[in-house]
Swiss-Prot record:
CDD domains listed in its UniProt record: Peptidase_C19R
A Pfam family the protein falls into: Rhodanese
Residue ranges annotated for the Rhodanese domain, each copy included: 205-328
Molecular function GO labels: cysteine-type deubiquitinase activity
Gene transcribed to yield this protein: DOA4
Role summary: Ubiquitin thioesterase that acts at the late endosome/prevacuolar compartment to recover ubiquitin from ubiquitinated membrane proteins en route to the vacuole. Also removes ubiquitin from soluble proteins targeted to proteasomes. Is essential to maintain a normal level of free ubiquitin. Involved in the ammonium-induced down-regulation of the GAP1 permease and the UME3 destruction in response to oxidative stress. Has a role in the RAD9 checkpoint response to TOP1 poisons. Required for promoting coordination of DNA replication and avoids DNA overreplication.
List of catalytic residues: C571 (nucleophile), H880 (proton acceptor)
Protein name per its UniProtKB record: Ubiquitin carboxyl-terminal hydrolase 4
Catalytic activity: Thiol-dependent hydrolysis of ester, thioester, amide, peptide and isopeptide bonds formed by the C-terminal Gly of ubiquitin (a 76-residue protein attached to proteins as an intracellular targeting signal)
Modified residues (Phosphoserine): S443
Quaternary organization: Interacts with BRO1, RFU1 and VPS32. Associates with the 26S proteasome.
Length: 926
């Protein structure tokens, strides 16, 4: 088998003209070998025992090779050359791992013998016969293999090696292309990025690349390409008659010494890259500089054999529009020496402003009912927060924040005093000039009852943009047919951290920022003959909305109901779409297209808007059919599913999937597409000193600070609507030392406790199980940094931030994919106040006071109203998904089953034993 795989890998390398194969290519080889050795021929009749033996044999080879791979990777990290034989061993080992993984996780679970053994294990607690002993041994072997795969540390290193090697190969190829180019040629942003990356990793004694920015020093200081060796040569500082000596002695006379030294070494660089902006004079001077360096370098002649001079195609504007537009830096004075953790050490919060939050967020229309008025004067949980400020009659009155937190959002414009209204409650969270805001809302005047805008100062109403502008932006921002180049969005058990930027509440609860929630609100055989494997988007497909005419003044009926066709086991997708569209705030921004203005094509984890725009298209199609149709109809979400599959291959085929995983993927993907901070650098880890100080703070304060740090890298409307946070605290039983991490969530997965024969299980029981203090087993004990060894320890989760819309996943499947069918009783009105961290003790970090930490809507009580239930029937391998969704007072609850939907006669039907994912939104005054 080994020689066969090696031969296949070599053939593929020759075919692709590459020393390395990609992860996808190696996975395809593994799948082919499984078909060849496991499924076809004589292997077709192999039983569970034979498959397990095959896996054990392959695993032993994998483990043996892993020892050699550690040495290979270690040598590579030290800069040593890697032989072709070593590369083959690494690629071979990946194929071995993938073969075992596919057999254990896919092939074996589909064996009838495996299903019978699981059934016997779950239904029989008696008997010790040979058959049962044999079955027990087989299951032990299977579980051991599965655990070995999950805990294997080598595969991550192998994948990292393969990916980095492929990246380096690509860089080398592009650099070779540059080596063949002549001085004076134009290079693309891709080629420049390759040269910069190659230079950063180069071990050569020759200096690699020097960039010369031909713009004014002011523009250069504002923003320039981020690289080590770069100088600014102002276009006005030289002329055609200059030589290289004149450039050094005259043009650079006021430049920093570091730039002068770089220019003095210009003839030692392998590449010199010139770039400027679109200014006509600057472009002309760029040509003049090229001529000086090539033809008038008398003091230090530049040889084309040693140093090549290129011009950046499309200049700096082209670089900004490219995939590397985020790789820019500023030379202006800054606080770059301030660490992210300085807020804990000396109370300096200005470090957070280094990563800019967006100026705008999507606008959402909504009305506040009378229950909100009561909340506006409710007390806050922090001792130092005062009651609501009296209404100000002066229209120029603007509430401000104090101390260093004013710097946090210093890039935003102040609100226009003319937009203020003396009849509105003076809510600082809606008028702070220096804070970003998540969502502008509409709320009635508490005196007149009229619908007046509550203005987030920096956020215009997006629906005022014309449809023409929207369509233009669509075409400019996205090539809809570039699915093949989309990086996958990896769905996690709890979605990737995402944050919102809701402004600070001053003196009283921030409830209006939460009032968006005031609105009420599969695994089956295919019901369609369409084969997903045949589905494709033609080159003519585009995301136009010519079939819909959204206007700024249109009053959408957000409670529309339309069925969705099953494309082959796609009920898992249909039920989640129906529930998600029960979230009025989200539906609104995709109907009025205000989302489009916030697509961030430079977001590192986004799909360049593919997912968001095809989701918008689906919402428009559903709304149009509901509006125009006179009877119950359904539509096909085929193109949306294709878009999902292009982003994550898990949803590409017609195989069965978990609806909660799709829910996490969808919200995570929409967030990344709309993430206004998606190109910001990641947060630095806290120093030991900062972490020690954080541990002394209450969860209430520490979690607020961590949320503020979070905001600097992730901010979108998805975050603002669905994001929460919990704390995970480890505690040593010997010395009582603690360590706490703060984890954001979009879908909160809670366990189902064991059923007490006397009592039913409630969702509150599940939350108690989720937040209980857990004693860690011997093999899970924490390595206490204070004791410097593993000690008896505990772990406890605490919810520190509850979102506007809470999605709860009932964990019905265990690690062996067995389903817990116990009836979990969940109410229409859920109170989670007891589970929210409310431990504020009056202690703040040094130098920080109560005026500086935003509350961001975290004011109890936390009551939630049910508006959606995704139900699962059957097993994970053969079941079906449906949904109950609340569609307002007029339509009430509807039951969705793919293409079919019907009113629910008794709303109590929404409370049922098949509930799997629950959708709640926060309500007030109840």
């Amino acid at each position: 088998m080994e020689q066969n795989i090696i031969s296949t890998i070599r053939d593929e390398c020759i075919r692709h003209r590459s020393k390395y194969l990609t992860i996808a290519q190696l996975t395809a080889i593994a799948e082919a070998k499984i078909n060849e050795f496991i499924i076809t021929g004589k292997a077709k009749d192999q039983d569970l025992s034979s498959l397990l033996d095959k896996c054990i044999d392959i695993l032993s080879i994998y483990k043996k090779n892993s020892k050699d791979i550690k040495n290979i990777i270690s040598c590579k990290n030290k800069g040593a050359m890697i032989s072709s034989n070593s590369v083959m061993i690494i690629q071979l080992n990946y194929v071995y791992y993938k073969v075992i993984h596919i057999i254990v996780t896919t092939n074996i679970p589909h064996l009838s013998e495996f299903a019978k053994i699981k059934l016997h294990k779950s239904t029989s607690d008696e008997g010790n016969g040979n058959n049962n002993n044999n079955e027990f041994q087989l299951m032990n072997i299977y579980n051991t293999l599965l655990e070995t795969l999950l805990k294997d540390e080598n595969i991550a290193k192998i994948k990292s090696f393969i990916k980095s090697s492929i990246k380096q190969t690509k860089l080398n190829h592009e650099q070779e292309e540059c080596n063949l180019m002549r001085t004076g040629s134009y290079i693309t942003s891709n080629q420049l990025n390759s040269l910069i990356s190659s230079s950063a990793n180069s071990t050569s004694s020759q200096m690699e690349i020097l960039l010369i920015d031909i713009r004014s020093r002011l523009e250069f200081n504002k923003s320039h390409i981020d690289t080590k060796n770069i100088i600014c040569l102002e276009p006005i500082s030289f002329k055609m008659s200059y030589s290289d000596h004149d450039l050094e002695k005259k043009s650079l006379i006021t430049s920093p010494n570091s730039e002068i030294k770089m220019f003095q070494s210009r003839n030692l660089f392998k590449f010199i890259i010139l770039y400027t902006d679109a200014n006509e004079y600057n472009v002309k001077q760029q040509s003049v500089l090229l001529d000086i360096l090539v033809n008038h370098s008398f003091e230090k002649p530049i040889s084309d054999d040693f140093t090549k001079i290129f011009i950046l195609e499309s200049g700096f504007p082209g670089w900004l529009k490219s995939n590397y537009g985020s790789q820019v830096s500023s030379s202006s004075p800054s606080n770059n020496n301030i660490k992210d953790d300085s807020v804990y050490i000396n109370g300096n919060t200005s470090g957070l402003s280094l990563q800019h939050l967006p100026k705008m967020s999507p606008s959402i229309r909504h009305s506040m009912d009378d229950s909100m008025k009561e909340m506006l004067v409710a007390p806050t949980p922090l001792n130092h927060l005062q009651q609501q400020q009296q209404q100000q009659s002066d229209n120029d009155h603007v509430l401000k924040r104090s101390s260093s937190f004013k710097k946090l959002f210093s890039n935003y414009t102040s609100p226009n005093p003319k937009n203020s209204n003396s009849n509105l409650y003076s809510i600082s969270s809606l008028s702070i000039s220096s804070s970003p805001s998540p969502l502008p809302l509409h709320s009635p005047d508490p005196v007149k009852g009229n619908s007046l805008p509550i203005n987030y100062p920096e956020t215009p109403h997006l629906w005022k943009n014309s449809e023409t502008d929207f369509m233009t932006n669509q075409r400019e921002q996205l090539n809809h047919n570039s699915f093949a180049h989309i990086a996958p969005i990896n769905t996690k058990a709890i979605t990737s951290p995402s944050r919102t930027a809701t402004p600070k509440l001053q003196r009283f609860p921030q409830t209006i920022s939460m009032n968006l929630n005031m609105n009420s609100n599969g695994h089956s055989s295919a019901t369609s003959t369409i084969q997903p494997s045949c589905l494709s988007l033609s080159n003519n497909d585009s995301l136009d909305h010519t079939d819909v005419t959204p206007t700024s003044s249109h009053n959408y009926d957000l409670d529309f109901a339309v069925g969705l066709e099953n494309l082959g086991n796609s009920c898992y997708m249909n039920c989640i779409i129906q529930c998600i569209l029960g979230t009025h705030e989200l539906t609104q921004i995709f109907l009025d297209d205000s989302y489009a203005k916030h697509i961030n094509i430079n977001s590192k984890l986004g799909s360049k808007g593919i997912l968001a725009k095809y989701f918008a298209r689906l919402v428009h199609m559903m709304y149009k059919e509901q509006v125009d149709g006179s009877k119950k109809i359904s539509i096909s979400p085929i193109k949306f599913k294709l878009a999902c599959g292009s982003v994550n291959s898990l949803f590409k085929t017609a195989s069965q999937q978990d609806c909660q995983e799709f829910c996490q993927f969808l919200l995570d993907g929409l967030h990344e597409d709309l993430n206004q901070c998606g190109s910001n650098p990641p947060l630095k880890e806290l120093s030991q000193e900062a972490e020690a100080r954080r541990e002394k703070l209450s969860l209430r304060i520490a979690s607020s600070i961590e949320w503020e740090r979070f905001l600097t890298t992730d901010f979108s409307v998805i975050v603002d609507l669905f994001q929460g946070q919990y704390a995970s605290r480890l505690k040593c039983k010997v010395c009582s030392h603690t360590s706490t991490t703060y984890q954001p969530f979009t879908v909160l997965s809670i366990p189902i406790p064991k059923k007490n024969s006397r009592n039913n299980i409630t969702i509150e029981d599940c939350f108690r199980e989720f937040t209980k203090c857990e004693n860690l087993e011997v093999d899970e004990q924490w390595l206490c940094p204070h004791c410097k060894k593993r000690q008896p320890s505990t772990k406890q989760l605490t919810i520190t931030r509850l979102p506007r819309n809470l999605i709860v996943h009932l964990k019905r499947f265990d690690n062996l994919l067995n389903k817990n069918n116990d009836f979990v009783i969940y109410p229409f009105l859920l109170d989670l106040t007891p589970f929210w961290a409310n431990d504020f003790d009056g202690v703040f970090p040094p130098g920080v006071n109560d005026d500086e930490l935003p509350i961001r809507g975290q004011i109890p009580p936390f009551k939630y109203e049910l508006y959606g239930v995704a139900c699962h029937f059957g097993t994970l391998y053969g079941g079906h998904y449906t949904a109950y969704v609340k569609k307002g007072l007029k339509k009430g609850w509807l039951y969705f089953d793919d293409t079919k939907y019907k009113p629910v006669k008794n709303k109590a039907d929404a409370i049922n034993s098949n509930a799997y994912v629950l959708f709640y939104h926060r309500v007030y005054g109840v």
